[in-house]
C-alpha cells in the first residue's frame, strides 16, 4: 500500500492561536513527500478523520502547519490537544494552486485564508508582487495579517460589520480595486467565491478557486465529493479548480451535498 495513504502519527511541535476559533498545528515533515499550497491532508485524532488545508509549508525548517477552525466535535477535540500530543496525518492529496505571471491577487474569506497564506509565502519568495484581500465577519476573525505583512504582501481588509477596513463583503470590496493582475487565487465561503469569480471573469483575470466538500476517502474512490454535472472529484481533480472548469459545475455557488448525498442550498 502507498505509504501516503496510511496515516503517519506525528507529534504536535507547536500550536499558534490565530484567533479565538482558529489554531495552527505545526509538525515536523519529511519533504520527500512534496506539499503544494492548496493541497489538503486528512487529519486523524484516533477516533475520526477530516480533511484540512495546509497553511504553512517550510522546507527550510522541515515543517508544515495545518490551521483548524473550531466548529464541531472533531475540531473541539483537536483544539483540546497540546504541544507534544499526537495526530495522524494522511496525504497530501489533490491539486494545488499554480503560480503564473508577476502580479497576483489573493482573495480569502475566514478560514479560507489558510491555503492562501501558504501560497503567499511561495509567491513572495519567488519575487512576485502579491495583493491580498482578506475578508471576515469581524476584525477578530481576520487571519494571518501579521504573517502576510512580514512577507511583503499588500493587504486590503474588509469585514461584514466594518470593524476593520471596508464595511461589506469581499466581492463588494473587489469592485473598488482597480489593480490589474496576472492571476487570482480565491478561497472562502462558496457564495463569496461565486461572486468573486464573476467579477474576475468579467475582468479576464485567470482565477483558481479552492472548493470544500464532504469527503471520506480522499483518493477519488468513494464518490462522496463528486460535483454535478461534471463528475469532478474535489479530492482528486480539485480542491483547486480554474474558473473555466467551475463554470461547467451546476452546483457551484448554488448547493452542496450533505453526508447522505442530499442537496443543501448555500
Curated annotation (Swiss-Prot):
It comes from the Archaea. [2Fe-2S] cluster binds at residues 217, 222, 225, 235. Residues 5-99 form the FAD-binding FR-type domain. Heterotetramer of 2 PyrK and 2 PyrD type B subunits. It comes from Methanothermobacter thermautotrophicus (strain ATCC 29096 / DSM 1053 / JCM 10044 / NBRC 100330 / Delta H) (Methanobacterium thermoautotrophicum). One of its GO terms (biological process) is 'de novo' UMP biosynthetic process. PROSITE patterns: 2FE2S_FER_1, FAD_FR. SUPFAM superfamilies: Ferredoxin reductase-like, C-terminal NADP-linked domain, Riboflavin synthase domain-like. This is Probable dihydroorotate dehydrogenase B (NAD(+)), electron transfer subunit. The keyword Iron-sulfur applies.
